[in-house]
Amino acid sequence: MPQHTPSDRWFTVEAIDADTYAISEYAHWEEPHCYLLNGDRASLLIDTGLGVGQIAAVAAGLAGRPVIAVLTHAHWDHMGGLRGFPAFAAHRAELDWLTGQFPLPPAAVRAQLNDPRLPAGFDLDGYRVFQGRPARLWRGGETIDLGDRQLQVLHTPGHSPGHVCYWEPAAGYLFTGDLIYLGELAADFPSTDPQAFLRSVRRAAALPVRRILPG
């Protein structure tokens, strides 16, 4: 059953299994989902949401240890909470958007972020898109080792040039970001490559997936 975390009621936490949690922002029209994975040696947060609440504190409370953050892609609604994670990882093809060349002007992002359900006191006018250099740049094909859990980094371009999915073969979990989600898959953004998008979806469809966990 979904539970609001006591440390930040903006987020809803749902247990996927005993060591995997969805951290969602259902109060915003985007409804982004991030995922906290606990291994016996390390914990991983896939995406960091809008940057409205303190997702770093929520993740640390679920993990009980420092958390590694990784991105599926560098869109504002997936990287907003990265200020709580000085060292994070993303694909190298997203680097320009992370270090000063984000394509949307601040006013356009704030217009998309605006929602009547934002927390009281949230400074919408002061909101800025996260900018920062990753501590690690993916190429695709890397393995993330959490001890008793391993994930593979799959480069799945299309939604954005450096979009990646995270594949956990032992569990059959595929964390898909904005490659696959419920509803119509939008492929008409300026940064979207429809042909690459289709190839990436077909690649994902060929995996022995037991559960898709979208962003």
Model-derived segments and their meaning:
Residues 1-9:
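Basic/polar N-terminal segments that are highly enriched at the extreme N-terminus
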Residues 9-61, 165-181:
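Conserved beta-strand hairpin/beta-sheet module of binuclear metal-dependent hydrolase folds
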Residues 15-21, 122-126, 147-149:
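Short Pro/Gly-enriched beta-strand edge/turn motifs at strand-loop
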Residues 22, 77, 95-96, 162, ...:
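Active-site micro-motifs of SAM-dependent methyltransferase domains
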Residues 25-26, 127, 133-135, 155-157:
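Short Gly/Pro-enriched turn/cap motifs at secondary-structure boundaries
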Residues 39-40, 63-66, 82-88, 169-171, ...:
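Short glycine/proline-enriched coil/turn segments at helix->beta-strand junctions
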Residues 42-45, 50-51, 136, 143, ...:
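Metallo-beta-lactamase
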Residues 50-145:
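Active-site HxH/HxHxD metal-binding segment of metal-dependent hydrolases
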